[in-house]
Regions:
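Conserved, mostly hydrophobic/aromatic
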Residues: 61, 74, 113, 170, ...
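Flexible, acidic/Gly-rich N-terminal and inter-domain linker regions that tether
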Residues: 1-69, 458, 466, 474-503, ...
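Conserved AdoMet/S-adenosylmethionine-binding subsite of the radical SAM
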Residues: 96, 119-380
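Canonical Radical SAM [4Fe-4S] cluster-binding loop centered on the CxxxCxxC motif
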Residues: 64-93
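Short, charged beta->alpha transition segments
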Residues: 62-64, 93-104, 295-296
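A glycine-rich phosphate-binding loop feature that marks nucleotide/adenosyl-phosphate handling sites
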Residues: 32-34, 214-221, 345-350, 385-401
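Long, highly charged, low-complexity intrinsically disordered interaction regions
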Residues: 353-425, 461-517
């Protein structure tokens, strides 16, 4: 029978949960695992995150650091070794006790565990491995676990811990290796990218061993949905690929890819059988696991079944939005990332060498990056389409999809009754669910704008870019400035009416704009 949570553990929890608040982990689990009658807890693929704080962060995971002690001196981190803060460390048993007690009280549905660096990356990962082993095998906790991989730990311990967690993430930290050297001098580019490659290969091998297609496992909960979707968009995917191969688009996308390579040296060959550069312990993970008896039967489990993710800090260094999304795209394409998270920089240390002192964090910029990220993951966009060398920032007043659309009016208007899957997805105001409803419904009847509204299409954005049976909703002119002004007014009328021409580029709407409709 479990004991109640002691006051000492609760005091540690107060300190270490506060220290973990800048780690971003607001996602559903991505892994399905029902209860088996013997263990406690379960994981569900479509959303263990039910509750969010006011700033949008998920609170259904117990999100803590194992310790806030650290041997590194990263300028952006509150736990840097030169900061005078109270230092505390959990034991593996304490983390297990907290997780199980909170789960039984229905406070949480999973665990997000990160850590500062105690002694060395290898020693820290060994402690995290012990914690997860006890949770899974002694306390029989079957819920969702997201673990932070520590750059510099050995492949041995990363392999073993990957069979105990659902998701593992190694933080990229900054969009460029140059930025990393400037603000986190103790962290090495190779020690970040190499474990990412190791985890990627481990996930691929594990899924092949269990007979699962990597794409099907990542994108769809059941096989029927997978094959229905593939049949539906097969021709559309071919047309999208042809569009991406066109000279203008391919040139811009090639520039974005080269920018990502330059930012992090992603073109270099990485050795998955790596030896970490910063480890300084008397024996490795294999000796540690053998000596403690904390070994597991690896083939019985999936390796990191919910995939790996990473995180970039936005606004700590001078990278543009174009550079950030180019690196994110490379992470998805070259490392099979499940998610790339973006965290608006907060200068918690009031470091004069970093921006943001006395200023709010760039939350709007973070939001725009997430919107662009979704366009790349689900809507068929590439980084080189959304931004370019000539236009390296997202618009503050309209979302990235609208920004792309008003800059590519030659692609519009789109006929709702005949356009293919990915063409419809590029229309502002039309999402993935709406596209599926449209394609299904138009087989049986002609669709009207009223029908589209019932299907979830946001007409205040879409009406400028679509026709139904050859007709637009209003007599709208396809003019970039005209449409942009209307989009801004629809989203933020207070801002638009108060804007002056010099500060905001776009003109205030006149009575003639309304008359022309």
């Amino acid at each position: 029978m479990l004991t109640s949570i002691s006051a000492d553990i609760m005091e540690k929890l107060k300190i270490l949960s506060d220290a973990a608040k800048f780690d971003v982990a607001c996602t559903s689990s991505g892994a399905s695992r029902s209860g088996n009658g013997n263990d406690m807890g379960s994981a569900f693929a479509s959303g263990i995150c039910h509750s969010f704080t006011a700033d949008g962060r998920c609170i259904s995971l117990l999100k803590i650091l194992f310790t806030n002690e650290c041997i590194y001196d990263c300028k952006y981190c509150i736990n840097r070794c030169t900061n005078d803060v109270e230092r505390v460390t959990f034991t593996p048993e304490e983390v297990c006790n907290l997780t199980v007690e909170f789960y039984r009280r229905n406070y949480i549905e999973g665990l997000f565990l990160s850590s500062g660096i105690i002694e060395s990356p290898e020693h820290t990962m060994q402690l995290l491995y012990t914690t997860l082993f006890l949770l899974r095998n002694k306390y029989h906790f079957n819920g969702y676990i997201h673990i932070k991989g520590i750059p510099g730990a050995s492949s041995e311990v990363l392999e073993m811990i990957g069979y105990l967690c659902d998701r593992m993430s190694v933080n990229l930290e900054l969009p460029t290796a140059e930025g990393l050297r400037a603000v986190a001098p103790n962290k090495v580019r190779k020690n970040i990218l190499t474990p990412m490659r190791f985890i990627q290969n481990g996930i691929k091998d594990s899924r092949m061993y269990h007979g699962n297609s990597s794409m099907r496992n990542r994108m769809y909960i059941d096989e029927q949905a997978y094959y229905e979707q593939m049949a539906e968009i097969k021709d559309s995917t071919a047309r999208l690929s042809e569009y991406h191969r066109s000279l203008r688009v391919a040139t811009e996308c090639g520039k974005a890819d080269k920018l990502a390579e330059k930012s992090w040296g992603l073109g270099e060959q990485l050795d998955p059988e790596f030896v970490c550069e910063t480890t300084d312990v008397s024996y490795g993970a294999g000796d540690y696991i053998n000596n403690t008896g904390l070994s597991i039967k690896r083939p019985d489990r999936y390796y990191v079944p919910a995939g790996q993710s990473t995180q970039m800090i936005v606004g700590a260094t001078g990278e543009s939005d174009y550079q950030i999304i180019s690196v994110a795209e490379a992470m998805y394409n070259r490392f099979d990332m499940k998610r790339v998270f973006y965290s608006a920089f907060v200068n918690v240390n009031m470091d004069e060498s970093l921006p943001g002192i006395g200023q709010p964090p760039p939350l709007k910029r973070e939001h725009r990056l997430y919107q662009a990220d979704f366009l790349m993951r689900f809507y068929g966009f590439k980084a080189g389409e959304l931004l370019s060398e000539d236009n390296q920032s997202f618009n503050d007043y309209i979302d990235p999809k609208c920004q792309w659309a008003v800059g590519h009016l030659e692609c519009f208007p789109v006929e709702i009754m005949t356009a293919d899957y990915y063409t419809l997805l590029r229309v502002p105001g039309i999402g993935t669910n709406s596209v599926r409803r449209i394609i299904k419904a138009r087989k049986h009847a002609k669709l009207s704008f009223t029908d589209l509204k019932k299907m979830g299409v946001v007409l205040k954005r879409a009406l400028y870019f679509i026709t139904c049976d050859g007709r637009m909703m209003y007599n709208t002119k396809l003019d970039e400035s005209y449409i942009t002004r209307h989009l801004i007014y629809n989203e933020r009328p207070d801002t638009m009416l108060l804007a002056d021409n010099k500060s905001y580029t776009y003109e205030q709407m006149s009575i003639f704009d309304f008359i022309s409709e």
